[in-house]
Amino acid sequence: MLVLKRKQGEAIHIGDDVTLTVLAIEGDQVKLGIDAPRHIDIHRHEVYIQMQEENESARNSANLMKQMIQKQSEA
């Protein structure tokens, strides 16, 4: 993991298309501004994890449904 220090108003570039700017530091929170093309998905970590869990649950449900249909057609 690359670790960088930035002050308020300073930025980091990721590749050619993404700029991450420290907009404000308020107590124990840092406000970030992200400038990226619209095709790049950006999510808070906890939201991303929740999305992954929901996608896995949906895949499991779809697989279970598929198995149930196969069993019915075999009977």
Swiss-Prot record:
InterPro entries listed in its UniProt record: CsrA (IPR003751), CsrA_sf (IPR036107)
Pfam families documented for this protein: CsrA
Gene Ontology BP annotations: bacterial-type flagellum organization; mRNA catabolic process; negative regulation of translational initiation; regulation of bacterial-type flagellum assembly; regulation of carbohydrate metabolic process
UniProt keyword annotations, A-Z: Bacterial flagellum biogenesis, Cytoplasm, Repressor, RNA-binding, Translation regulation
A GO MF term: mRNA 5'-UTR binding
Record keyword Lyase present: no
An annotated GO cellular component: cytosol
Domain of life of the native organism: Bacteria
Subcellular location: Cytoplasm
Disulfide pattern: none
Record-stated family: Belongs to the CsrA/RsmA family.
Function: A translational regulator that binds mRNA to regulate translation initiation and/or mRNA stability. Usually binds in the 5'-UTR at or near the Shine-Dalgarno sequence preventing ribosome-binding, thus repressing translation. Its main target seems to be the major flagellin gene, while its function is anatagonized by FliW.
Subunit structure: Homodimer; the beta-strands of each monomer intercalate to form a hydrophobic core, while the alpha-helices form wings that extend away from the core.
Protein name: Translational regulator CsrA
Organism: Exiguobacterium sp. (strain ATCC BAA-1283 / AT1b)
Organism placement in taxonomy: Bacteria, Bacillati, Bacillota, Bacilli, Bacillales
